[in-house]
């Protein structure tokens, strides 16, 4: 048993890898704050009002240094918080230790098993003193899914009887165990939730699907589609963190290689830019004719995965879809081709189909898959997020954009929840512009101010918003 789990049995309301890392984590948190002006200024603006006083936030989001600054912003504004990571490999152990030492219950360490992951996802809803979480801050939708699926299983256990992958095996087992102990565990907690703010594309897809089917049990704010999130975190964050992960894992020379990026949304665009910037020849696969045309107009060759599989050196999935790289693709790849994913879930690459072959672990989150003919394919982070599994994720500055949106969304939903139906919303344009404005001074950017005549000429307030909601940045 991991030492961190043993700690949790000694009446300590946290599970981390090593509390001796806390001081190191605190030093990095202090550095990160200097690069996260949006969060720091939001603390200053709202700390006297304490708008989150009474909020009990169940957080499921990568437990990194940057997330630590988010957590301490939420608590500075009055919230009580319990936190787990949304990925088994993404935790930075020194960050988790620092936040736990400061008094926030954290249940996360790098390299969790799937059983531990789902146990920790339950722990964020286990509030002391008979209280319950009333807000969810989610990344990928697992915390939201847990309560909704568990509540459904209370009425019909058959919904957790037929797992289709190892993730579902662990999830269903965990739900069944909790139902055996308390048959109303999930519905009791679900009834207290006022709303969720969702960080990423995959989780947002889940929310919109539930809304469409009339199954969304509480209001949701789609943080991902704030312009200052999707056009910054997804694009510029991935532009820096993808190659950081690949190079830390493999030390490969990117220049001269053929790299395939599956998906040319905001994440794929950032990935393609970074690989081309280091001298790779970049090919793109796409299902959407608009995105495919964008890629072609940027000078990328648009191909199919079937065409590229036996020709390219590096493969990156960035689609949010299922089995974008399948078994036959990997079987066709060159010896020592590098395969990785930067979408939220590990299902973009059909990793399960390769378990029949020999795996040779090179170092943490770097494996050789050895095919029967002796060919090896290098798989990074077991098909999970390469930038967080093999590196430390996005830089602090760009995460300040995303997490300032999260903070404002939590404030809005907690303080104004009665205004919202059980639907998915996005933050209003004036808040999107506010988030951007908070970050300009840090990078030496100075805004031009419209004159009254100029503002009148184009029909906007001189202080914004400057664009209509349908504007595409």
From Swiss-Prot:
Annotated substrate binding sites: 64, 139, 199, 229, 233
GO molecular function: adenosylhomocysteinase activity
Reported function: May play a key role in the regulation of the intracellular concentration of adenosylhomocysteine.
Pfam families linked: AdoHcyase (PF05221), AdoHcyase_NAD (PF00670)
Cofactor: NAD(+)
PROSITE patterns xrefs: ADOHCYASE_1, ADOHCYASE_2
Binding site for NAD(+): 200-202, 234, 263-268, 286, 321, 342-344, 387
Reaction equation(s) it catalyzes: S-adenosyl-L-homocysteine + H2O = L-homocysteine + adenosine
Superkingdom to which the source organism belongs: Bacteria
Protein name as catalogued: Adenosylhomocysteinase
Cofactor note: Binds 1 NAD(+) per subunit.
Main location: cytoplasm
InterPro entries per UniProt: Adenosylhomocyst_ase-like_sf, Adenosylhomocysteinase-like, Ado_hCys_hydrolase_NAD-bd, NAD(P)-bd_dom_sf, S-Ado-L-homoCys_hydrolase_CS
Keywords, sorted A to Z: Cytoplasm, Hydrolase, NAD, One-carbon metabolism
Family: Belongs to the adenosylhomocysteinase family.
Compartments (UniProt record): Cytoplasm
EC numbers, comma separated: 3.13.2.1
Coiled coil: none
EC class: hydrolase
GO terms for cellular component: cytosol
Organism of derivation: Paraburkholderia phytofirmans (strain DSM 17436 / LMG 22146 / PsJN)
One annotated GO biological process: S-adenosylmethionine cycle
Pathway: Amino-acid biosynthesis; L-homocysteine biosynthesis; L-homocysteine from S-adenosyl-L-homocysteine: step 1/1
């Amino acid at each position: 048993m991991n030492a961190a789990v043993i700690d949790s049995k000694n009446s300590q309301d946290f599970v981390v890898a090593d509390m001796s890392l806390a001081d190191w984590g605190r030093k990095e948190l202090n550095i990160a704050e200097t690069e996260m002006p949006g969060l720091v200024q939001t603390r200053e603006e709202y700390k006297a009002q304490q708008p989150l006083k009474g909020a009990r936030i169940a957080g499921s989001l990568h437990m990194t240094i940057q997330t630590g600054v988010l957590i301490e912003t939420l608590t500075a504004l009055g919230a009580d918080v319990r936190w787990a990571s949304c990925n088994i490999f993404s935790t930075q152990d020194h960050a988790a230790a620092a936040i736990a030492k400061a008094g926030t219950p954290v249940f996360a360490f790098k390299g969790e098993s799937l059983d531990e992951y789902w146990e920790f996802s339950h722990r964020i809803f286990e509030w002391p003193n008979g209280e319950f979480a009333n807000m969810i801050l989610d990344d990928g939708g697992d915390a939201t899914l847990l309560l909704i699926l568990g509540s459904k299983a209370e009425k019909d256990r058959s919904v957790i009887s037929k797992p289709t992958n190892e993730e579902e095996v662990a999830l269903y087992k965990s739900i069944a165990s909790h139902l055996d102990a308390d048959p109303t565990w999930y519905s009791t907690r679900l009834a207290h939730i006022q709303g969720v703010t969702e960080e990423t594309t995959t989780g947002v897809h889940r929310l919109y699907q539930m809304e469409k089917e009339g199954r969304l049990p509480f209001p949701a704010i789609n943080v991902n589609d704030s312009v200052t999130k999707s056009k910054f975190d997804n694009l510029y964050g991935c532009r820096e963190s993808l190659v950081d992960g690949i190079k830390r894992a493999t030390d490969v020379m990117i220049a001269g290689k053929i790299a395939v990026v599956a998906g040319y949304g905001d994440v794929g665009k950032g990935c393609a830019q970074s690989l081309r910037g280091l001298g790779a020849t970049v090919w793109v696969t796409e299902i959407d004719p608009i995105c495919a045309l964008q890629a072609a107009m940027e000078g990328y060759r648009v191909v199919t995965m079937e065409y590229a599989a036996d020709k390219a050196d590096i493969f990156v999935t960035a689609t949010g879809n299922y089995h974008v790289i399948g078994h036959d693709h990997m079987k066709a790849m060159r010896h020592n081709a590098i395969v990785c994913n930067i979408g939220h879930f590990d299902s973009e690459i059909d990793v399960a189909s390769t378990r029949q072959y020999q795996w040779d672990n090179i170092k943490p989150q770097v494996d050789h898959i050895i095919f029967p003919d002796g060919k090896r394919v290098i798989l990074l982070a077991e098909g999970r997020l390469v930038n967080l599994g093999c590196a430390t994720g996005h830089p602090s500055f760009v995460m300040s954009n995303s997490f300032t949106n999260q903070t404002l969304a939590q404030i809005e939903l907690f303080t104004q929840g009665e205004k919202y139906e059980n639907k998915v919303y996005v933050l209003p344009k004036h808040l999107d512009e506010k988030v951007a404005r908070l970050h300009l001074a840090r990078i030496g950017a100075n805004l031009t101010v419209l004159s009254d005549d100029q503002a009148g000429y184009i029909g906007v307030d001189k202080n914004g918003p400057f664009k209509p909601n349908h504007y595409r940045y």
